[in-house]
Amino acid sequence: MVKEKKKADKKGDKSARSPSSISDNPEASKQDSNASKQEVAPSAVVPVVETPLKQAPKRDSVQMEQSEEETQYEEPILTKLIVESYEGEKVRGLYEGEGFAVFQGGNTYHGMFSEGLMHGQGTYIWADGLKYEGDFVKNIPMNHGVYTWPDGSTYEGEVTNGMRNGFGMFKCGTQPVSYIGHWCHGKRHGKGSIYYNQEGTSWYEGDWVYNIKKGWGIRCYKSGNIYEGQWENNMRHGEGRMRWLTTNEEYTGHWEKGIQNGFGTHTWFLKRIPNSQYPLRNEYIGEFVNGFRHGQGKFYYASGAMYEGEWASNKKQGRGRMTFKNGHVYEGLFSNDHIAQFFETEMDYSQSLDRWSDASQRSRQPRGSSVSAVREPETLRKLDGSESRSVLGTSIELDLTLLLDMYPEESQEEEKKQVEYAVLRNITELRRIYCFYSGLGCDHSLDNTFLMTKLHFWRFLKDCRFHHHNITLADMDRVLSVYNGIPIEEIHSPFRTILLRTFLNYLLQLAYYIHHKEFQNRSPSLFLCFTKLMSENIHPHACQVKGHLFSEQQRTLYSMNYIDKCWEIYTAYCRPNEAPPYELTMKMRYFLWMLKDFRMINKDLTATKFMTVIAEDNPFVYDGTDSNFELELVFLEFFEALLCFSLCCMFDQMTRSYLKVPYDDITTNRYGSTQTILNQSIHRSPSAITSHDSEVHFSSTKSSLDKIGALPDGKIRQSEPKLKKSLSEDKVSKMNFKTQGRGLVFMSPQGEKYEKPKDEQKEKLNIWVNNLYVFFVSVLFSAYKREEMLKEKVKENQLQEAELAQQRQIENEELEARLNILREEEARKQDFELDITVLKEPSEIPASQPLTPSPPKEDLASIQTSKASPGKKKKK
């Protein structure tokens, strides 16, 4: 019987592959770290589970392999099953039903038998600990099952002939690696996803061909970099896109063996600097060889410059065409990333090159690359847009349609030509002015190109005294909105950006509005208006910055920290204009009322001082006797007035404000907030050394101010000289330093006399920063917050009163309705009672008495006397 069982088992033997160790092969890194970055895939082990019955599969140790070839295991031939013991049912001498068998060698099986074979649900355990739980079909694992290895690795899914086949999930026990997808003959085959870490940040999802990535797939690396495209032999091969999120780069194109090869596009996304005019994106479109820019290609620089020509190993080599950002073009030979011919030139084209972009590229490339600043006279020319009718070319287009409509049709062409000539003659000066004002209040930019905002434009108009022509800045905004179709909500917005061509259009429109009456009978009128504006306003006064906001770079950076909140306050207290387009505006009267509501008008900041501050930059506000409170203020005038107010009441009011705050708040919250502002401005300042000095000496200022905050009110005045003295003493006791080259040289206290003027300047700046913070945060913003809370409280009270009034009205209506119902019920009740009374009157006659006529009264009297007489007789 045992021999027959052996034969049956031998017939049912099937071969199976033992589990093999599979690693995610690392891919070769590219040679060029700039244009051809290669993400190295983390290697991991994914054992392939195989299920022999007669012999325990050899489970290879899980290890990180660096080779691309996987260790392959031959399918072992099943040995004979020799049953040493059996516990269970038998039918006609064959195992049947549930039973437990122990085989020779230590393997065991517990489960269902049929006709002497393992058939149905069961658990087979090899002597080395490998276990299979699932379905058996005639001694063969089939359909669905779970494999568990001694190290904890598991596979659960479909099984065919003892091998993983179909859909299943594998989890490695020694490493956080898992695979879920399709299998074929024990190997990953078809669609599947593999995860290389427990967090799920490193994974591959796509096509597999017998444990090899082949076809289309997405690979996400632990660093966050992502590749999406075609694969071949576990490497990027074919068309695909790689995104390096860590360096903000992207390549889309052809790959060969994990490296860029063929035609593609590589883009460098760079962080945009605030107020920068360009999107700051460098892009190369062309041919690659082994990860290098090699062959024909175009390189677009972030500033607008562009190179088109031949490349060799990431360098411009051979014939090419370089278009600089100022519009000039060099076309000729390049050698080793430089223009081939060198000579002297009057124009300094080093400013024209996008040095920032080249520096960015040099930092990323294995070998340096730069573009020379020289040119060849025969091949350098200006892009003047010969196909354009404008003398300014295609780079600058003036929108003169509405202005020319003011002139007769026959003279419009001449007016346009003459004014374009006038702009062309002054274009260099106007570009310089635009660049100067657009950079006010901005940090140093790598490409030195900024966008002008309305705030800069207002400062330009006031510096050039446009408002001296009996027109306010608010009026100018409305004029420009008519010509340019600006939305109502953005007419007076300080953050609206202005391009160079828009800046030129604004100047022409304002020139016409200011001087058109003077030259209306002369031709060319628009030319004369613009020329007079240039000669009387722009040339003499441009770039001579006045006011309190942009006068000093360091203070401007500090002041910009409060501009957003001040804009919120400004818009909150604006009122609709009485004339079209009915936009929100701020009049001087509203401004003064706002300060009064904030309780800031006192002996330090009087109404007279308020008027004097506003009139500093506007002669039409106050002439010493009469004041005009109806003048409108744009946000620049509003904000600069606040800055001036912070200087007017700089010490007395600030000290009192400090005394109103608990000492703990002074030493913690206020200092922390001020320090934050200092640190923010330090990062934005062009000189890190200067900012660092300010940060160091600010601590001494804080300690002195804290001492003031702890003093009683009566000792404040006496402590003011001590404050200044203590500040100086702190600086003597503290470590002094000065800049030498790029480093810091620490000095002894004896060197103070050499640094005294510099320290005094820093001390003034630090005190100004503290006072500025206290004025805006502790005084202005706190008062605004209090007013807003009061307004909200008033609104809440009004809503509550309205709700109560409505509720009372509803209650009164309900009460009135109830009274009406009661009245109606009472009336119905009375009517009902009346009806009952009427009905009761005829029904009072007894129904039992016969309806006979009553005897007359005389008869009744005789009857009574007759009844009484016998009694009398009896008594007698």
Curated annotation (Swiss-Prot):
Interacts with RSPH6A. Does not appear to be part of the axonemal radial spoke complexes 1 or 2. It is found in: Cytoplasm, Cytoskeleton, Cilium axoneme; Cell projection, Cilium; Cell projection, Cilium, Flagellum. Residues 17-37, 356-372 have a biased composition (Polar residues). Expressed in ependymal cells (at protein level). The keyword rRNA-binding does not apply. The gene is Rsph10b. Residues 790-832 form a coiled coil. Residues 39-50 have a biased composition (Low complexity). InterPro entries: MORN. Keywords: Cell projection, Cilium, Coiled coil, Cytoplasm, Cytoskeleton, Flagellum, Repeat. GO terms for cellular component: 9+2 motile cilium; axoneme; sperm flagellum. This is Radial spoke head 10 homolog B. Residues 1-71, 356-386, 839-876 are annotated as: Disordered. Residues 1-16, 375-386 have a biased composition (Basic and acidic residues). SUPFAM superfamilies: Histone H3 K4-specific methyltransferase SET7/9 N-terminal domain (SSF82185). MORN repeats lie at residues 86-108, 109-129, 132-154, 155-172, 179-196, 204-225, 227-244, 251-268, 284-305, 307-328. May function as part of the axonemal radial spoke complex 3 (RS3). Radial spoke complexes are important for ciliary motility.
